[in-house]
């Protein structure tokens, strides 16, 4: 069974609480349950990690290599726009990685339009609500099969 690591960055633990008009009203826990169900259907083992701290996210990406993780789905939150360190960590481990965003980052404030992480990733999915994670799972199924 292929193992997928889902990493969520800053403030994503507040899904269902923060800016419901942008991120929806589904709780973080319910998002994880939805991802788990779909991952199981697709034959993936899934592990979740959330941190509001850049260094912890980088450490987790490094550990993914040594733990033989097959793929990563990452929602870097605001780190999307300036974390060259997360970009470099993804490049370093050479694990298929998909960057996801709940909102369409290109339809929001100007500073959110650029991702410095996407160039290190296999692809980017943005703007489909929590379904962005599910779409990423389908993409990984194609990539890993």
From Swiss-Prot:
<feature type="binding site">
    <location>
        <position position="75"/>
    </location>
    <ligand>
        <name>substrate</name>
    </ligand>
</feature>
<dbReference type="GO" id="GO:0009423">
    <property type="term" value="P:chorismate biosynthetic process"/>
</dbReference>
<dbReference type="GO" id="GO:0003855">
    <property type="term" value="F:3-dehydroquinate dehydratase activity"/>
</dbReference>
<comment type="function">
    <text>Catalyzes a trans-dehydration via an enolate intermediate.</text>
</comment>
<feature type="active site" description="Proton acceptor">
    <location>
        <position position="23"/>
    </location>
</feature>
<feature type="binding site">
    <location>
        <begin position="102"/>
        <end position="103"/>
    </location>
    <ligand>
        <name>substrate</name>
    </ligand>
</feature>
<comment type="subunit">
    <text>Homododecamer.</text>
</comment>
<dbReference type="InterPro" id="IPR018509">
    <property type="entry name" value="DHquinase_II_CS"/>
</dbReference>
<dbReference type="GO" id="GO:0019631">
    <property type="term" value="P:quinate catabolic process"/>
</dbReference>
<dbReference type="GO" id="GO:0008652">
    <property type="term" value="P:amino acid biosynthetic process"/>
</dbReference>
<comment type="similarity">
    <text>Belongs to the type-II 3-dehydroquinase family.</text>
</comment>
<comment type="pathway">
    <text>Metabolic intermediate biosynthesis; chorismate biosynthesis; chorismate from D-erythrose 4-phosphate and phosphoenolpyruvate: step 3/7.</text>
</comment>
<dbReference type="Pfam" id="PF01220">
    <property type="entry name" value="DHquinase_II"/>
</dbReference>
<feature type="binding site">
    <location>
        <position position="81"/>
    </location>
    <ligand>
        <name>substrate</name>
    </ligand>
</feature>
<protein>
    <recommendedName>
        <fullName>3-dehydroquinate dehydratase</fullName>
        <ecNumber>4.2.1.10</ecNumber>
    </recommendedName>
</protein>
<dbReference type="InterPro" id="IPR001874">
    <property type="entry name" value="DHquinase_II"/>
</dbReference>
<keyword id="KW-0028">Amino-acid biosynthesis</keyword>
<dbReference type="GO" id="GO:0009073">
    <property type="term" value="P:aromatic amino acid family biosynthetic process"/>
</dbReference>
<feature type="binding site">
    <location>
        <position position="112"/>
    </location>
    <ligand>
        <name>substrate</name>
    </ligand>
</feature>
<feature type="site" description="Transition state stabilizer">
    <location>
        <position position="18"/>
    </location>
</feature>
<dbReference type="InterPro" id="IPR036441">
    <property type="entry name" value="DHquinase_II_sf"/>
</dbReference>
<keyword id="KW-0057">Aromatic amino acid biosynthesis</keyword>
<feature type="active site" description="Proton donor">
    <location>
        <position position="101"/>
    </location>
</feature>
<keyword id="KW-0456">Lyase</keyword>
<feature type="binding site">
    <location>
        <position position="88"/>
    </location>
    <ligand>
        <name>substrate</name>
    </ligand>
</feature>
């Amino acid at each position: 069974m292929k193992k997928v690591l889902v990493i969520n960055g800053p403030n994503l633990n507040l899904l269902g609480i923060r800016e419901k008009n942008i991120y929806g009203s589904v709780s973080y826990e319910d998002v994880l349950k939805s991802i788990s169900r779909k991952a199981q259907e697709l034959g993936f083992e899934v592990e979740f990690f959330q941190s509001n701290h850049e260094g912890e996210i980088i450490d987790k990406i490094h550990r993914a290599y040594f733990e033989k993780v097959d793929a990563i789905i990452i929602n870097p939150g605001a780190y999307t726009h300036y974390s060259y360190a997360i970009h470099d960590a993804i490049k370093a481990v050479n694990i298929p990685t998909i960057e996801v965003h709940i909102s369409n980052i290109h339809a929001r404030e100007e500073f959110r339009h650029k991702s410095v992480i996407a160039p290190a990733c296999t692809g980017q999915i943005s703007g489909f609500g929590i379904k962005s994670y599910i779409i990423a799972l389908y993409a990984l199924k194609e990539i890993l099969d």
